Amino acid sequence: MQNSSPSTSHYTQVPIKVQHKIAKKRSIRRKRIDLPCGCSYYLHINCHNHGFTHRGTHHCSSSDEWRVYLEGSKSPLFQDHKAPQAPVQLQPRHHSSPDTVQSQPEESIGDTQMLPGLHSFHSLTTSDLAFLEGI
C-alpha cells in the first residue's frame, strides 16, 4: 500500500512535550561574576550587552568579557586578556539620597491613598465587591 503523505522523507517530528522535557534536563549555562563590593551574581551565557545598577555603580556584561565553552568541558575557546575596565559611575539624580537604606513610611490608622473615605467594607454592595474581586 502506498503512503498517503506527500512527503517522501521518513522524518517524524518530535512531540513538543518531549522537546520540553529534553530542554529542562539541559544544564543552565551561566557565569558567576564577583563584584568589588563582595556581592556576586550569575549571568546566563546567552545574555549579553545588558547592564544593571548595583549600589550606585553601573555594571555591563559585554561580549568582550565572555569565555565560550564547549559541551561543559570548561576549556575556553576565546579569552579576552585585556585589563578590566572600571565600572561607570552614575551621576547623582534629584531623587537619590546619600543613605543606602530607604526609610519606609510609618503605618497609620485612617484613609488609604487608594480608597479615600472608605471607612468600612460593610458599606460596600455586592456589585462593589464583585468589581473589586475582578481587579
Curated annotation (Swiss-Prot):
It is found in: Host nucleus; Host cytoplasm. This is Transcriptional activator protein. Belongs to the geminiviridae transcriptional activator protein family. Monomer. Homodimer. Homooligomer. Self-interaction correlates with nuclear localization and efficient activation of transcription. Monomers suppress local silencing by interacting with and inactivating host adenosine kinase 2 (ADK2) in the cytoplasm. Interacts with and inhibits host SNF1 kinase. Binds to ssDNA. GO terms for biological process: symbiont-mediated suppression of host innate immune response. A zinc finger (unnamed) spans 37-54. The keyword Transferase does not apply. The lineage of its organism: Viruses, Monodnaviria, Shotokuvirae, Cressdnaviricota, Repensiviricetes. Keywords: Activator, DNA-binding, Host cytoplasm, Host nucleus, Host-virus interaction, Inhibition of host innate immune response by virus, Metal-binding, Phosphoprotein, Suppressor of RNA silencing, Viral immunoevasion, Zinc, Zinc-finger. Phosphorylated. A motif (Nuclear localization signal) lies at residues 17-32. GO terms for cellular component: host cell cytoplasm; host cell nucleus; viral capsid. GO terms for molecular function: DNA binding; structural molecule activity; zinc ion binding. It comes from Tomato leaf curl virus (strain Australia) (ToLCV). Residues 77-109 are annotated as: Disordered.
